[in-house]
Each structure stands twice: as C-alpha cells, then as structure tokens.
Amino acid sequence: MSITHRLGAGQAALPVDRDDPSAGLSARKPPLLAAKSLRAMPLTRRYQSCWLTPEGAVQTSTRLAPATPLFEEAFSALARGSVLMTEDGPVAIEDLQPGQSVLTAEGRAERVCWIGSMVIYPGAETGRDLEEQVSLTRITAEAFGAGRPALDLVLGPRARLCLRDPRLRRVSGLEAAYVPARAFLDGISVIEVTPSAPVTVYHVVLEQHGSLRVAGLEVEAFHPGEGVERMIDPRMLSLFEAQ
C-alpha cells in the first residue's frame, strides 16, 4: 500500500510504499564535480634551485609551488641541451654550475649566481592564463642570419631575445630591447613546439644582469624586476635563495 505525504504549498507529492520506503525515490546519483572545475584547480610544479652561497659553496633545493606566471618566468627560458658560452668554452645548460663565468653579449664575463629549473609535462592542464607555458619555441639554424643560431635552438616558454636594431632608437630611443621569443613565431623558421615527452627547462641569474650567448643568439638572463619581494608571499621567496 502506498501513501502520499502531505507537503507544503508549491511542493510536489512523493508517493511512498510502506513495505518499501525507498520505492519512488530518485535513483540518480549526486552530480560529480565537473571536469571543467577540475581543470580550473591551480597547477603546482616542482621547482629546483641551485645557488652560490656567500662562502662560495653550491646549494640546491626543490620546492613545490603554484605555477604562477612569476614563478614560471624564473624557471623556463632555456630547454635542456642549450649550449652557453663560458670562460671554459661551450657548456650545456644542464651542466652549468653556480660559480662558473659565462660570456655575455655585452662583452663581459659574468659569474652565475643562481640556476632554476622545472619540468614541463605534455598534456598538463594549466588554465587559460598559462596556456603558453607548455609550449616551446624552436628556432631553426640561421633563422636570423649566418650563425644566428648556429644550430637549431629550443627555448622555453619565457625566453626573451635581445633585439638590436637601428629602428629601435627611432621608436624608443633605446639601442636594444628584450622581446619574447614567441613574438617571432612564423611557422617556418621559428616554430611553436608542444613536447611529446617531459622536458626540463632552465633559467640563470648573473652577478650583473646581461644577455647570455646561446648558440649565436642573445638570450636575456633572468631578472625579477624591482620590488618583486612585495609581490609574492614571503614563504615563496625561498625559491630565490641566492637573491
């Protein structure tokens, strides 16, 4: 036998069987968290830092932190295999150590104070604000002229190239300017590449800011800018121990 509960005005009656109280109840499961909501969750990465202490010792640390643009920029300019010019000759970025001196495009030898690295995983969800953070930029040999670069060069998402052009003076009054490598994408000699396997990318801080000589191109060394300590949580500043 079934009865109908008396409900308030505007509510639909729900028939209930006394012998089977569950009869008539909806079998629908509660809604699951939408996939879109899952993708909206902030991405975190493992960031590795390697720096030179005031005593001249090399220390390293690995921290988990949000994949914010500020952090991504500090760790993602040069892909593994990029070769830099140093006082000791060409050195791959993965073999470079704090304390070594690199040759800058400005004609100086500058000591490396800090090296940061992270791994880009293919297919990682980064959200709309970080969509560009999983793609690399491949610059084919001599895309910018003889020996520039000497060989194909793969740069990280946040690499910036030093552009020296007489026209800059007319526009900005500057002799040179740093431009994102992605700005040169043309689909022919400068190509966007999505890695099919995990790729380690790096960035470098010099004792005095300058341009790294990488395969014949000038790539900006990392500089966080003025007042960065006021922009991020003090707990996150430990990622930049050397500074």
Where are these regions (language model features)?
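A short mid-domain helix/strand-loop element embedded in enzyme catalytic domains
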Residues: 63-85
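Sequence-level preference for short, compositionally simple segments enriched
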Residues: 2-61, 85, 194-243
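Charged, amphipathic alpha-helical segments
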Residues: 28-35, 65, 118, 183-189
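Structural motif
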Residues: 94-101
